[in-house]
Regions:
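Substrate-recognition element of Asp-dependent hydrolases with the DxDx(T/V) motif
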Residues: 74-75, 83-114, 126-129
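Short catalytic/ligand-binding loop motif for oxyanion handling, primarily in non-cytosolic enzymes
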Residues: 22-25, 30, 105-109, 161-163, ...
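A short, structured active-site edge motif that brings together acidic residues
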Residues: 101-102, 119-137
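Active-site neighborhood of HAD-like aspartate-dependent phosphohydrolases
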Residues: 2-63
Length: 206
């Protein structure tokens, strides 16, 4: 059971896009099955290295993702069923920002999708950190959240969650096969099954 965390008055909250707002990895795996003959499933992604589950190199993975980004599947990707409702509820509590490690060339498609699915008011700002390839010059999500004063963050990547938690940010970690760990999580990381679960664990819901 997740500890209830008080929602601060007029908080600045942040969220990742992929696998938090949209089931991107699940959709990508379906693309790999249909177009690449892969037999991997979402449950095979036990670590945050998709290429290992697919049995390909990291460079091949990047090429597969680039191909996926051009498909009707990616253009048709829609948010999780509860995403729009929960984001509207969080908007009543404060301002929301998006941080994503998506490549720069997806900016336009990303803005279009967020506008289409959430409207213009939910996410006041969208930041592309460009740290997907461990670019040494890129700003990390933790650094960005610290700079902006984000106090609550929704994420699916365990490493990023730990970094943010270490900086004193409250993190709601979406429970996924790739972020499982035997280590005990810090008290300000809360593993949740869905966005609804995350919101319901925040005190002050009513």
């Amino acid at each position: 059971m997740v500890m209830k965390v008080p929602i601060r008055t007029r908080l600045l909250w942040g969220t990742d896009i992929d696998d938090v707002q949209y089931p991107t990895r699940e959709d990508f795996i379906q693309f790999c099955q249909a177009q690449k003959g892969s037999t991997a499933s979402l449950q095979d992604l036990r670590r945050d290295h998709i290429e290992q589950a697919l049995g390909i190199s990291y460079q091949e993975l990047k090429c597969w993702f680039e191909e996926y980004y051009t498909t009707p599947m990616f253009r048709a990707l829609r948010p999780y069923d509860d995403a729009q409702r929960i984001m509207q509820l969080l908007l009543e509590r404060g301002e929301g920002i998006v941080t994503t490690a998506r490549p720069d060339h997806l900016r336009h498609k990303t803005y279009e999708a967020l506008e289409r699915d959430f409207g213009s008011r939910v996410f006041a700002r969208v930041y592309f950190t460009n740290d997907h390839d461990n670019n040494p010059g890129a700003q990390t999500k933790m650094e960005l959240c610290q700079e902006l004063g984000v106090t609550l963050f929704l994420e699916d990547n365990l490493r990023i969650a730990l970094e943010c938690a270490g900086a004193g940010i409250e993190v709601f970690l979406m429970d996924q096969p790739w972020n499982q760990t035997d280590q005990e999580l810090p008290g300000n990381i809360h593993r949740v099954k869905s966005l609804t679960h995350a919101y319901e664990s925040m005190n002050g819901r009513h």
